[in-house]
Amino acid sequence: MKTVFAILFLAFIALTYARSYEDVKEEIKNEVEKEILEDLEKETDELNERKINDAKPWRWVRDIRWRKLVPFIPVVVAAVGKK
């Protein structure tokens, strides 16, 4: 009989000090969000540290505005030839 009262007493204390369901749900949600953000930060750091293997390494050549640079090529060649 004493063990039954002890278990009931402990259950009563646990229910008295237990948080509400919404508080527990909010805390779990915050912890999960925190872990996700930490994982994303780690992955971002790893991607920034690692050299990305580009499938088209000469892509930057296409980005050069050749029409604007072509008129200056003879000037550069002449300047290099004088040295």
Swiss-Prot record:
Positions of the propeptide removed during maturation: 19-55
Keyword terms: Amidation, Antibiotic, Antimicrobial, Immunity, Innate immunity, Membrane, Secreted, Signal, Target cell membrane, Target membrane
UniProt-annotated location(s): Secreted; Target cell membrane
Residues with PTM Valine amide: 80
Signal peptide: 1-18
Annotated tissue distribution: Expressed in entodermal epithelium along the body column.
GO CC entries: extracellular region
Keyword Cell membrane: no
Family according to the record: Belongs to the arminin family.
Function: Antimicrobial peptide with a broad-spectrum antimicrobial activity. Keeps its antibacterial activity under a wide range of salt concentrations that mimic physiological conditions of human blood, which is surprising, since Hydra is an obligate freshwater animal with nearly no salt tolerance. Does not affect red blood cells.
Protein name: Arminin 4364
Originating species: Hydra vulgaris
